[in-house]
């Protein structure tokens, strides 16, 4: 027989195999929405097909081993392409991937397949993954968050309001004893949580074990004084998985309620390992998104944060940082609330105005509390309460520790402001229009809040948003 029978070597157009506009998507498919900017002269169908091919079964040439498998069963398919309104030479390409292409319960494998290779592709000037639809069948292979929102409230015995946190500053340079002292002052003043900064791991000036011990002491002392359950996010992120687990185990032995992980720098494999340990041992897990802007900041290349947020809900975490919205543009507010809902809710309808490309059903996977953190202070409290609602964590670092009288009064000011906003909202007042008045009224009864109002009355962070539709 001749070698050429049934197999023709050579390079052929991707779109012949991988562009299938009449494909009906299956309930079990993983669906992706990519924003493509093709190179000049590359038609969008060919670019979309190339993305589908290179992120699934394809390679740059036909190979004889293609005959040993059923490509129709395993190939990714570009099933729809639409131009992006208001942008020149940008398209949204929708790609469907058969479920069989992915390992169960592995966010790592999902990302390696979908975004591992194709972003360096020459036919594309730029590529951004805007959204993923995770099918129910795949969601069910993940444990998800160790505990979720309801279980966390039950553990903490705190209901009907957002939770309050604070990142301990200066983030690097304090000794363990002084660090613990700062934690104690914040918790005593009325915060629910304090937080290790994301880059506090185990450095020469403060080794992790010493920090854990002094923070545990601070937690127990503050709990005894206030009669409330307190926590400090002990950062277990480390250079190896084994070291990370050692830190998590020690936190459990100390009896503290919560640990922390940097999920992008630490990696999804490490994060999922830690999340499983946390569920098995009753630890809450706070997730910081350090490095996210490297991936999600460019509008035309990388990955939108909503994809990283979905991935975190699958991998596991009880809190995740999600931006603040405050003082930014309206468009960004809708987009942020879109992925905040993806983190918290069980079922989210497709809504392009909020950046949600697909309807997502989480089939009772526990929810994640969004954390608003970064440049916020007491004057932002009404807006934050209105935007994020009860199921959130509001974190004021400088907005607590920058109080002229110290940490504990700074914590008091934030707690009073929060309780005032929640009470006003429950009485039916409009936080958006009456916010400043509500804070001013409350400050008459709280000298700590009055001092905070005075010091931060003029501070704003006004820059145009990067992230528009």
UniProtKB/Swiss-Prot annotation:
Function: RuBisCO catalyzes two reactions: the carboxylation of D-ribulose 1,5-bisphosphate, the primary event in carbon dioxide fixation, as well as the oxidative fragmentation of the pentose substrate in the photorespiration process. Both reactions occur simultaneously and in competition at the same active site.
PROSITE patterns xrefs: RUBISCO_LARGE (PS00157)
Catalytic site positions: 169 (proton acceptor), 288 (proton acceptor)
GO biological process, one term: photorespiration
Superkingdom per UniProt: Eukaryota
PANTHER family reported in the protein's UniProt record: RIBULOSE BISPHOSPHATE CARBOXYLASE, RIBULOSE BISPHOSPHATE CARBOXYLASE LARGE CHAIN
Molecular function terms, GO-annotated: magnesium ion binding; monooxygenase activity; ribulose-bisphosphate carboxylase activity
Binding-site residues for Mg(2+), renumbered to this chain: 195, 197-198
Subunit structure: Heterohexadecamer of 8 large chains and 8 small chains; disulfide-linked. The disulfide link is formed within the large subunit homodimers.
Name of the protein described by the UniProt record: Ribulose bisphosphate carboxylase large chain
Additional remarks: The basic functional RuBisCO is composed of a large chain homodimer in a 'head-to-tail' conformation. In form I RuBisCO this homodimer is arranged in a barrel-like tetramer with the small subunits forming a tetrameric 'cap' on each end of the 'barrel'.
UniProt keyword list: Calvin cycle, Carbon dioxide fixation, Chloroplast, Disulfide bond, Lyase, Magnesium, Metal-binding, Methylation, Monooxygenase, Oxidoreductase, Photorespiration, Photosynthesis, Plastid
GO CC annotation, single: chloroplast
Protein's organism: Akania bidwillii
Pfam family, one: RuBisCO_large_N
This enzyme's EC code(s): 4.1.1.39
Family (UniProt): Belongs to the RuBisCO large chain family. Type I subfamily.
